[in-house]
Amino acid sequence: MDLLGPIHDILVIFLGSVLILGGLGVVLLNNLIYSAFSLGWVLFCISLFYISSNSYFVAAAQLLIYVGAINVLIIFAVMFISGSEYSNDSHLWTVGDGVTSVVCTSIFFSLITTIPDTSWYGIIWTTRSNQIIEQDLISNVQQIGIHLSTNFYLPFELISIILLISLIGAITMARQ
């Protein structure tokens, strides 16, 4: 979107706060259906971030794949889970909860320390005069493909493994 600087900044701050609230809704809501809808809202807000950074193809792919397919699959799997199986009232932490929280906290802090040190040379940024800065004249879709198969190959594969594990877990929970 070609917006003025202050309007763009206000939009990014608003989308970021809505994204954080939606993420908290995913984690903190007790009803699984509300949590799944909150996840859909988070994925929709991420696509709005892509639109605000002039990445329309990635935004459309985000809407179609994640909001349209993955979130519907998660809601479908959640609807098959009976409430009596998972409504135990024990609020005690187990060893798995502790291990999971340690792993997630370490990933969070490693991301916080890694992101500022990353060179973002391949990303197309827009300047204040709304001119797109590009090194070569290939389209955005080609740049995405080139970067996914060269620079971002390992993160792309790790994300696909995480998605595969989450889908296997959802199917396993739905069958039980």
Swiss-Prot record:
The keyword Cell membrane does not apply. It holds the Pfam family Oxidored_q3. Gene3D superfamilies: NADH-ubiquinone/plastoquinone oxidoreductase chain 6, subunit NuoJ (1.20.120.1200). The chain crosses the membrane at residues 10-30, 32-52, 63-83, 92-112, 152-172. The keyword Transmembrane helix applies. NDH shuttles electrons from NAD(P)H:plastoquinone, via FMN and iron-sulfur (Fe-S) centers, to quinones in the photosynthetic chain and possibly in a chloroplast respiratory chain. The immediate electron acceptor for the enzyme in this species is believed to be plastoquinone. Couples the redox reaction to proton translocation, and thus conserves the redox energy in a proton gradient. Belongs to the complex I subunit 6 family. This is NAD(P)H-quinone oxidoreductase subunit 6, chloroplastic.
